[in-house]
Design a protein with these regions (language model features):
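Short amphipathic alpha-helical segments
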Residues: 72-76
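Long beta-strand-rich cores associated with HINT superfamily self-processing modules
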Residues: 67, 80-187
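Conserved small/polar residues in nucleotide/adenosyl-binding loops
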Residues: 194-199, 203
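Charge-rich amphipathic alpha-helical interaction elements
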Residues: 3, 89, 190-192
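Short, flexible, solvent-exposed loop/turn segments with mixed acidic/basic and small polar residues
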Residues: 31-32, 62-70, 110
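Short amphipathic beta-strand starts and helix->beta connectors
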Residues: 52-66
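Intrinsically disordered, low-complexity polar/charged tails and linkers
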Residues: 1-55
């Protein structure tokens, strides 16, 4: 059984590693060109087997439908400095020829009830195996550093309380999500100040 899981997950691991390399290379290309990169850093993971099994049970996913019905077995996360960078990255990914966007969820304009904000893409990505090509679904989450900090804390609390966060804590989390987003908006305003031409530049 362990070998079965290893063989099943190996292409997903390959997909995550390839995408991390490509996105980090893209970040480097921005910097070499003298432009500010909308990508701050990139992480990725393959969902642990216990988490896959738990989600299969919760969503009643049959083993033979696992690749089709579970979209986040492979996950890549892109962190950005500013909210505007998130939408720049989304556009970059939409235009790429090595993947196809099949689903988008904008939790920034429409946050989850908990306060969670992020932009989710589900893409199909081709992995070249020894004798064939395999199309895999990969979930790409794009968020700011502030959104990621909040989501990390919320995830830890969900784990601690086994998915049942006390109402008082949930209310404070929701409030802190608004504070984090206000910080993002303020940082965007500051970004506009230092990227806009100064009065001295306009006179030249």
């Amino acid at each position: 059984m362990e070998d079965d899981w290893s063989n099943f997950l190996e292409p997903y691991d390959q997909a995550v590693n390839e995408l991390k390399l490509k996105l980090r290379t893209l970040r480097g290309q921005f910097k070499k060109s003298g432009n500010r990169s909308p990508i701050e850093y990139v992480t990725g993971r393959v969902k642990p087997i216990p988490s896959i099994l738990e989600k299969m049970k919760r969503r009643q996913i049959k083993p033979k439908r696992l690749s089709q019905d579970m979209e986040d077995i492979a996950g890549v996360r892109i962190m950005c400095q500013f909210v505007e960078d998130i939408y720049r990255v989304v556009e970059l990914l939409r235009k790429r020829k090595d993947m196809q966007v099949i689903e988008e969820r904008d939790y920034i304009k429409t946050p989850k009830e908990s306060g969670y904000r992020s932009y989710h893409l589900v893409v199909t990505y081709p992995v070249q195996l020894l004798e064939r090509e395999q199309q895999l679904k990969v979930e790409i989450q794009i968020r700011t550093l502030a959104m990621n900090f909040w989501a990390t804390i919320e995830h830890s609390l969900n784990y601690k309380y086994q998915g049942c966060i006390p109402s008082e804590v949930a209310m404070r989390l929701e409030k802190s999500a608004e504070i984090a987003f206000a910080l993002d908006q303020e940082m965007s305003s500051i970004c506009l100040l230092y990227t806009s031409p100064s009065p001295r530049d306009r006179q030249k």
